[in-house]
Amino acid sequence: MGQHRSQATLFLLSGIVLLYVVVFSGLAMARYNTFHASTFDLGIMTQVVWNTAYGRWFETSIDRATNVELIGSYLGNHVRPILVGLSLLYRLWPDPRLLLVLQSVALGAAAFPLYWIAHRQTDDPKAALIVACCYLVYPALGFLNLVDFHPIALSIPLLYMAYWALLEGRMTLFWVAVLLALFTKEEMVVPIGTWGLVNLLKRDKRCVGIGLLTMAVVWTILCYGVIVPYFNDGQPYRFFQLWSHLPGFSKSSVQGGTAQPLAEASPETVILFLVHLALPLGFLPLLGPASLVVALPTLTYLLSGSRPAFHSVGYQYPAVLIPWFFLAVSEGLQRLRRKASRHGGLRFYRLGLVFLLIGTIGANVPLNPVLLYAQAGAFQPDPYHDQIVEALAQIPPETGVAVVNRLGPPLANRRVLVVLEYPSPLRLDHVQMADYVLLDLVDCRTVPALDPRAEYANIVTQVLQTGRFRVRYWSGRILLLERGTPSEKELAAVLDYVADLVEQKRSCWP
């Protein structure tokens, strides 16, 4: 009877996972199709995967470590060997939407090993189903799935698989999953190393702990001491500057810029971030300290970092926290279940499940990613959608293009793609390597300046005044330039249009 119930529950979970994958794949592609995705980061990942697929391993013109040469190696910024595996699939369907679908499939499929873990720890298939379903509607997971593509999202199913394999004693699968998780991003050394320390404290898991620590230390040395400096002109990991305000971090020891403005987290921001993480879980991770402690170093460096996105569930950064929080939930339920069996009552165990359900449902009222994205119009075409399509149709494949952030993803399958807003200051010599320039003359949301409207007008003016580009297509706010001798009358009209936007103090969006 128990086995039949477990099979029925697993069958139900399969249907729910399939629904999740279909819905989130569709929404992610709708966001892409309506030009609401971003070159940072979907365009970056697409270009790196496309280049790698055709033998130019980790080559990028968008997210290189320095602003000296236009084309460089992505390995000077981040170390993500898992992109090599994705590049093999990309040859079958060379389209950014492949990455979006793969991400949805991976995040949805992660519910299965989480279910197996919770089932094993609680011996309760219904509770395991609740945990898996709460994972699928966890707000931070939904935002992660919708905000472009990030390889670190793949670490979630891999870590669940590793944890389950360790419980089952399937050590080959365990080590393979851990290694692949490390390959999703260099920062994975933090939770893997911490997990190793936790296992060192368990008498029967000390060998596992030593192995995890060894892998984390070796990968740390390779990433931060060898690979990144080698591809970054001998300079250290440039994102260390996000913690340069802390003791021990010298501002002179870091180099390069970041695509987002910097700001330390206020106490209110920290509290709100923690509530957004913990409330949907009914605060149950507090009952699973063995897994919760693995998340604490990552949580600490996110809270102490000076990038505002670090302190929000609306971006990809909580991806490193999500698996450990849900593993702590499962461990917490296991603890409540054991206490219930010893004291002859299931009241607190059931109360824990109620807290989890209420927290999940309650948090999704104000913080549902699908509803928030829909309210922002992220799945609907803008009134000038057809103009963007018409402009894109006039750009030949693999020609060099300079573009604004939101219009870059469909153009990422090319070696030369220059994003005009970043890195700052604008390198006109890089822009002049492009054959086309595609602009939304209104959208200045991602310009890193105190007055983005004026700075964006300055960028457009600089591009036009190079004298290298003429108007190929102009309809309303969408402008396509191509290499050639410009018409002074057309350029003057564009400059007047941009100047009027500044004079009117036109908002960057919509």
Describe these PLM feature segments.
Residues A109-V137, I156-P157, T172-L173:
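Transmembrane-helix signature of polytopic, membrane-embedded enzymes
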Residues R120-T122, P151-L154, L159-L173, L200-R203:
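Membrane-interface transmembrane helices that cradle and orient dolichyl/undecaprenyl
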Residues V23, L27, T34, K205-P297, ...:
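Membrane-lumen/periplasm interface segments of specific transmembrane helices
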Residues L88, P96-T122, M161:
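Transmembrane-helix motifs of polytopic, lipid-linked glycan transferases
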Residues M1-G26, H119, P125, C207, ...:
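Start-transfer (signal-anchor) and selected internal transmembrane alpha helices
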Residues L292-R342:
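Hydrophobic/aromatic-rich transmembrane helices and adjacent perimembrane loops
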